[in-house]
Swiss-Prot record:
CDD domains in UniProt: S4
GO cellular component: small ribosomal subunit
Protein name, per record: Small ribosomal subunit protein uS4
Assembly with partners or alone: Part of the 30S ribosomal subunit. Contacts protein S5. The interaction surface between S4 and S5 is involved in control of translational fidelity.
Molecular functions per Gene Ontology: rRNA binding; structural constituent of ribosome
Record key words, sorted: Ribonucleoprotein, Ribosomal protein, RNA-binding, rRNA-binding
Organism, scientific name: Elusimicrobium minutum (strain Pei191)
Role, per record: One of the primary rRNA binding proteins, it binds directly to 16S rRNA where it nucleates assembly of the body of the 30S subunit. With S5 and S12 plays an important role in translational accuracy.
Residue stretches making up the S4 RNA-binding domain: 93-155
Top-level taxon of the source organism: Bacteria
Amino acid sequence: MARYIGPKTKIARKFGEPIFGPDKSLIKSERAAGNNKHAPRKKKMSVFGTQLAEKQKAKYTYGLLEKQFSNLFTKAHSLPGVTGEVLMQLLECRLDNIVYRMGLARTRAAARQLVTHRHITVDGEIVKTPSYSVKPGQVISVTEGSKSLSMFEVNLKGYDHAKYSWIEWKEPVSAKYVRIPERAEIPENINEQLIVEHYSK
């Protein structure tokens, strides 16, 4: 299954939340639906359908392909701890996700492009793999040649650098990943237990 590149509002509407980031079109469609008394009711999903939908939501949210997500779940299952929580922590430590959490990009898709286009370094070395697993203590920065790009100034204007306690800012476009976040700190509205149940069948 290839990475989804179609209309993102359509997918976000399916899950009822802006899983790809701020979405003005989604807000407008929700308002319209709320004012439509004759809008069709959603069909009740089966247990399997609910579990599958939660996995799909997690995949779309973090921008993973089916094989990537399956492999990450297998890794989470092999590590100590609660599998669902470990899965969420592995998703959070991906380089593209941390670039997004730093505010350098407004969506994870944009963060992924920054990484693949060689704008990002880890401990001073360019890393162009979005799935790179960042370790606590590593420093993520924008390359020297890219620091002058206006998009970083625009994206970081008014950004709350204290928003995520596991990311410690070093300078305007550089931060340290200080620790693995606890599940309760991860803001994504994902029921990881449903994903565990899906893969346990």
